[in-house]
Structure formats: structure tokens, C-alpha cells
């Protein structure tokens, strides 16, 4: 098992980009594909796209991002790649429904983002689980899917 305990930088950093470019032409850049929830973790174990068994053990002040370089030497590199995040888009009927939806999402500890009047909830599990919890608001029209 390969222990990765620090972030060396971002793949977009000019100092790292040239080295990564050369290694990628040689087929020596491995990726760790992380979900939106996994990218927030500081400790996890997973396999790279080439099958390397990796254990990420970061200090609390370090935060993974898409493109985080966790290993870089003359032979290979390991880079984090964030998986596409899917969202449940919800449109409240009015300001009262918006407040209720926001309050509910907060109580559920759901992360949210906004796109105009639409509240977007990142899906970290089956969409049906989210819809089941929102069923009363969807059924009476306080909230609809956007």
C-alpha cells in the first residue's frame, strides 16, 4: 500500500505542469477518482486507475481538490480527479417555501448551492432517497423539480 500524506500542489501549477506533461506522454500519470463527498475526506483508501493501492492520510488543514498532486517523482505521478457531481434541482413556489426548503436542507445537513431561484443539492447517494424525504413538499406543490 502506498501512503500519500501530503499535497504537493495542483496539476495546473506551472512548476508541476511540465513534469506531469512529460510523465503523461510516457503513460506514467495515475489518477485517483474521487466523489464529491470523498474529496472532502482527509483519510481514505482506494485504488488508482492503474490498480495501485493507495491510502490518503492528510492533515486537517490540507484539502483535496480536483487536480491535487499527491505523488510526483521521475517514474510516475498520482493526481486526484473529481468525478462529475450530479445535483437535484429544486424550485420553491414562493419565499415561504424557499425558507422552509432551506431550513429542511440544513436540518438534513445537505450541502446546497444556488443557481438563480433554484436550490441545488449535490447527490451523495440515490436520488430516490432525497426525493422520499422531500415528498411532502413536492406533493403539495411547495417545491417542484426544476
Curated annotation (Swiss-Prot):
Pfam families attached to this UniProt entry: UreE_N (PF02814)
SUPFAM superfamilies: Urease metallochaperone UreE, N-terminal domain (SSF69287)
BP GO annotations: protein folding
Localization of this protein: Cytoplasm
Alphabetized InterPro entries for the sequence: UreE, UreE_N, UreE_N_sf
Highest taxon above the source species: Bacteria
A GO CC annotation given for this chain: cytoplasm
Keywords associated with the record: Chaperone, Cytoplasm, Nickel, Nickel insertion
Example GO molecular function: unfolded protein binding
NCBIfam families, per the entry: PRK13261.1-2
Function: Involved in urease metallocenter assembly. Binds nickel. Probably functions as a nickel donor during metallocenter assembly.
Family of this protein: Belongs to the UreE family.
Protein name: Urease accessory protein UreE 1
Originating species: Pseudomonas syringae pv. tomato (strain ATCC BAA-871 / DC3000)
Source organism phylogeny: Bacteria, Pseudomonadati, Pseudomonadota, Gammaproteobacteria, Pseudomonadales
Gene name in the database record: ureE1
Amino acid at each position: 500500500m502506498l501512503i500519500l500524506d501530503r499535497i504537493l500542489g495542483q496539476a495546473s501549477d506551472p512548476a508541476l505542469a511540465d513534469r506531469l506533461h512529460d510523465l503523461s506522454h510516457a503513460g506514467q500519470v495515475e489518477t485517483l477518482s474521487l466523489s464529491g463527498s470523498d474529496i472532502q475526506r482527509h483519510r481514505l483508501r482506494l485504488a488508482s486507475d492503474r490498480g495501485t493501492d493507495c491510502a490518503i492520510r492528510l492533515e486537517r488543514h490540507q484539502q483535496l481538490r480536483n487536480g491535487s498532486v499527491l505523488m510526483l517523482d521521475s517514474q510516475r505521478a498520482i493526481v486526484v480527479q473529481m468525478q462529475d457531481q450530479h445535483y437535484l434541482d429544486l424550485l420553491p413556489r414562493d419565499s415561504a417555501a424557499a425558507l422552509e426548503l432551506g431550513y429542511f436542507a440544513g436540518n438534513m445537513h445537505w450541502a446546497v448551492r444556488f443557481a438563480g431561484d433554484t436550490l441545488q443539492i449535490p447527490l451523495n447517494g440515490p436520488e430516490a432517497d432525497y426525493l422520499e424525504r422531500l415528498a411532502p413538499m413536492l406533493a403539495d406543490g411547495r417545491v417542484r423539480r426544476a
